[in-house]
A protein has these predicted regions:
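Glycine-rich ATP-binding loops of the HATPase_c
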Residues: 2-10
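Short amphipathic alpha-helix used as the core "switch/output" element in two-component signaling
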Residues: 97-116, 134
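Two-component/phosphorelay signaling modules centered on CheY-like receiver
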Residues: 50-69
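Acidic, metal-coordinating helix/loop segments flanking the phosphotransfer/catalytic sites
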Residues: 68-87
Length: 152
């Protein structure tokens, strides 16, 4: 149940307002061309840290008409199947002491199985160039590091 504007509209604009996607081939608009008819989409933020969820909700509340959050990735599939989601921000690490990003990559693969066109932005505090490349090669739309800069 993905919002049709994702797959049918081919105009190129940033996905998340201030969180600009660098992969131009996957920039999918969430708003109509007319500023008077702005249609904001729905974002799903998945992170085990409640502080990160709250911070991203505050940061993105003016960019999206609806913000859904999940504190565990096992909620993703159910949410995607029952709600129209336009973009996902997905943490890469959920288990204590593990910071290799494999959990996030696993869930990215699961998302791609049921929603191949859904933009997924990977989020991690343990990022490096190698992990970013790995995420993008696994079809992530973009890669963000924690902490992020709200001004950009």
């Amino acid at each position: 149940m993905i919002n049709k504007s994702i797959t049918e509209n081919n105009k190129k604009r940033p996905i998340i307002g201030r969180l600009i996607c660098r992969n131009n081939q996957k920039q999918i608009p969430l708003a109509s061309e007319s500023k008077n008819e702005m249609e904001k989409g729905t974002i799903l933020i998945v992170d085990d840290n409640k502080g990160v969820l709250a911070s991203l909700e505050l940061l993105l509340e003016t960019e999206f008409s609806e913000i859904k959050t999940a504190h565990h990735p096992n909620q993703i599939i159910s949410i995607i199947n029952t709600s129209p989601i336009d973009v996902i921000i997905l943490d890469m690490n959920f288990s204590a002491g593990i910071n290799n990003g494999n959990e996030g990559l696993y869930w990215l693969k699961r998302i791609r199985e049921i929603a191949p066109a859904l933009p997924v932005v990977m989020l991690t505090a343990y990022g490096d160039v190698e992990l970013a490349v790995k995420a993008l090669k696994n079809d992530a739309t973009d890669f963000l590091l924690k902490p992020w800069d709200n001004r950009t």
